[in-house]
Amino acid sequence: MYLPISKSETRGLVTTLIVILNIIIYVLTSFENYFLNISNYWLEKLAYSPLLLYSGEWYRVFTSMFTHADIFHIFFNMYFLYFFGREVEKKIGSLKYLILYISSGLLAIVFHTAFISITSSIGLVTPAIGASGAISGVLGAYLLLYHRRVLTFCIFIPLPICFPSRAGVFLIFWFALQVIYGYLRFVSSIAYFAHAGGFIAGISLLYLFSPRTHDYRRFTIYNGVLYIVKTVRKGFGKFSKAILSILVLSLLIGSVYSITNSSKLNAMYVFNIATTSDGADISSDTAVYINDNDVILPTRDDPRVVFNRFLWSGLLKNEAKARYVDSDFKINLMIKDPVYGTNLNLYVAGFIEYDEQGVLKNFKGTITTDVLVMTRQGFIEKISIKPGVKYYATIESRVHGENIGLTILQPFSVISTIVSLTAMYIVLVKDRDLVEPEYVYEPVEYYNGYFI
């Protein structure tokens, strides 16, 4: 963990108010969990999920920006916001800063949604919370304004090691990690493309808000010699500009790809599964299916076994069975567990119905199958097969977010493309106009009382 340290005494009213508001909301939403993490109730009410936009719950794009998962999440977010935000607010003014903050958060959500077609379709239903996207916009603005400023950073591994570094080095390195981890689909609960999108949104928005006039003033110092004080704006160095350009270009390419690929995300299927075996009580659970690679399995054992058998055997989706209905369906198969590579017997009998896309719509009947039983002895995991386990099962599916790719993901991809193009232009051409100036003193020659 990197923590920036500075002696700056800048005060930012809006930054402080945003921090206080986030803390108040966290206290209210984590109270029942002893302030350690957010309660499930508030997570379901306030978190952002792209699929819920389809049902009109647009308020979540705002509420998710002020909601945090746990105490560490809010602590580090608010620390970085307070440290970097006050400087940006001082430079561009409180109102413009507030607009930049909120807009960066919204555009971070746009990028997070647009890049779902690249990362994983499960992101359509995965709740997202946190102010990180908006704060990333503040970091992007800070990079343009103060990339030459020297700060002290500390790494805790576990003892703190502190070292000086230019703000630009740290922020470009952090930005690179977000882009790289995002494209590598780094296994994490972090929305990397939301961070990256918020960052370049801050770069783009700063151009609208930051003053770009050069400051010239005359005054006399030392021996009556007249000087001009001129502000000189030094933009990014060649190496920094090259790295930033490559990173922004990668987001631009991803955005364009998302425009063409998002239309393939047509819908999401939610399966309600009820099973019983050997006279046991009925076990009910839910599964989510988008495609064969993007599946959320049931958490309960029996529904998960039944769902996996339909998934592995190709009975869950088969375009050849579009609109197929059979009240006396029977099939005997040998299937392979994709995790352990074990062959399993499967016999399915009962009523079965498929929709027009060839996705299982209804099933009511029996499933007889071999079941893998895993036992652990110390650090050793043993797998055995329990043959011929019979389940009585009912499966029903519902379609959610039909044409969500065209109605939400594709428009968001267009917006992310525009923001990426704008950020690229600013990094390549306008960086000198935005950086906080350095002051140079130049003597002025004069003859006969006239300045020339």
Q: Where do the model's predicted regions map?
A:
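Juxtamembrane interface at the cytosolic side of transmembrane helices
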Residues: 419-451
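A detector for small-residue-rich transmembrane helices and their helix-helix packing motifs
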Residues: 1-279, 291-293, 298, 396-431
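Extracytosolic and intramembrane catalytic regions of membrane-associated proteins
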Residues: 272-429
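Short, aromatic- and cysteine-enriched interfacial helices/patches
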Residues: 3, 35-36, 312, 340, ...
